[in-house]
């Protein structure tokens, strides 16, 4: 232990990152400083932080070709809630038009016909959607990643749907584990997605048909005044303290996600955390109706 206050600074900048249309940087503020030798705690009630631009290129430069003309509507909503200065930044710009972008569905060969109703529906509602057989791309994640990257630049890709279980549709491997979202990390070396990635996990045509039918019904027949649209569930283990995201335990990470959801449009987010959580809590939540479920922890 050293006779000094930690952390030494009151604020610091994180590494620059790219999230599709913008380059961002997080500012971390430390209103508490602790000296372990004197056991003294400093508490700052007011801190002013000045952030200045420099002429250096820095990490993860965003090489935009010309001025931004259009923006994916869903990403615009993300930007508004992600960047503290988004509205001020955009007020000094011309009007940027909303657009849908495009959707790419990569499927295991045996499920191609079962996906046609979904492709037809997506195109009918105005989202340009293309269905591709994974065998026409390549059977490994490197070939798929390159195809997705090329499609992103050529077709303004916004949504990627993988169809099939991992034995039929490989995932990107990160740290020895599969990571579907990594297919969406196109720009920079960060973990902020340029493309939203999902998967229909399926071992049979029946599995695919069920998910296709439910997806179409969810979009085509929205339920008026259904409160479950604004309810979610968070599931977290008691592990991970000190080694998780920003040193959080799994349940703390879920609580942070919960706070963001409650600050958005959600009215209720279940806290199914260890110790004490059980599968019955999850079953009850699902049967009552939830629009999103998040899990942080290890499988066994």
Name what the model sees in each region:
Residues 1-300:
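Cysteine-dependent hydrolase recognition
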